[in-house]
Amino acid sequence: MAFRTLDDIGDVRGKRVLVREDLNVPMEGAAVTDDTRLRSAAPTVAELADKGAIVLVLAHFGRPKGERNPEMSLALVTAAFRSVLGREVRFVGDCCGEEAEAAVAQLQPGDIALLENTRFHKGEEKNDPALAQAMAKLGDLYVNDAFSAAHRAHASTEGLARLLPAFAGRSMQAELEALEKALGKPEHPVAAVVGGAKVSTKLDVLKHLVARVDHLIIGGGMANTFLAARGVDVGKSLCEHDLKDTALAILDAADAADCIVHLPYDVVVAKEFKPNPPTRTVNVHEVAADEMILDVGPAAVEALGDALKTCRTLVWNGPLGAFETPPFDTATVALARTAAALTKGGSLVSVAGGGDTVAALNHAGVAGDFSFVSTAGGAFLEWMEGRELPGVKALEA
């Protein structure tokens, strides 16, 4: 897929550049508790400012539902963004209209302004052309650097890109290039790890992947549904029994596409789901009626590691077990470390995404060793489903 980037933007000196970023950071009181998204936004904003642009940052924050809510004002994020950038950032109390126009008129080349939460306007999430037009009045050029919001056709992500010359920022560019490498034009064999609690939330992902990957590793609670579909008694494990036929259809589609599906054959079980309860490691056919499967067993994890050693590309979304609760993080940590070692050794391109996945890789201490880790949740999932992302489509050259 060809798209325009900052390399194509030309001379920006004195130009007003509207830059859509994802600054939707977690807060505790007045403090930002994780500045990952601010750090991800910094390179594009700094590059444009250094080149003499007047940089106008657009972003959403929380879900104010079209109402002004001081608890969701981007004023709360301004100091942290200033600190990450290491330069002055002015806050402007609206993202369009007279107040914003007057504030922007005062700015000089190289200045950076953070405009107020786009979702304070009802038209943002409706992709209202009038709101997009009002925001477009502030700028000469548009840069979208928020892949995590690219699956939404909103006024500040899709509408604006139709009204001004539109380009991908550095974070968006890195994300798109990594995703293209992982599933667009990957080097085979390709493995996908898909985990999480429910098959129902990842149905479209699984259906899309079986025709595109060589190894499909299914973990988490959703593996129980596939095991049950194959006649395994999963005890009181989380399981969507009503989706057994769907699971069988996915397995049949995988067979037809020569995709090897890896389900656990040994598992870690417990009678209670709590930190460090008594556990047993058993064959999947030995789960007692009062036990639940909470992690993949060591023999299966070793076999999964061996499968990864034969692969050139890995896409990972979702943990293998209930990783937030020890000791059920063991399988996820072990396989993540294997993938990280293969990546560092140069034999594997590894791309991971989704909130739980990032948390799991951080927990394993290997997020920095993967080829690319996406902080996007919904957008990453929709990309894995093969859907067209409106915010990306609008940037195509």
Swiss-Prot record:
Substrate binds at D22, L23, N24, R37, H60, F61, G62, R63, R119, R152. One of its GO terms (cellular component) is cytosol. It is an enzyme of class 2 (transferase). The keyword 4Fe-4S does not apply. One of its GO terms (biological process) is gluconeogenesis. It catalyses: (2R)-3-phosphoglycerate + ATP = (2R)-3-phospho-glyceroyl phosphate + ADP. ATP binds at K202, E324, G354, G355, D356, T357. It comes from the Bacteria. It holds the Pfam family PGK. Keywords: ATP-binding, Cytoplasm, Glycolysis, Kinase, Nucleotide-binding, Transferase. GO terms for molecular function: ADP binding; ATP binding; phosphoglycerate kinase activity. Its main location: cytoplasm. It is found in: Cytoplasm. Belongs to the phosphoglycerate kinase family. PANTHER family: PHOSPHOGLYCERATE KINASE, PHOSPHOGLYCERATE KINASE 1, CHLOROPLASTIC-RELATED. Monomer. This is Phosphoglycerate kinase. It comes from Rhizorhabdus wittichii (strain DSM 6014 / CCUG 31198 / JCM 15750 / NBRC 105917 / EY 4224 / RW1) (Sphingomonas wittichii).
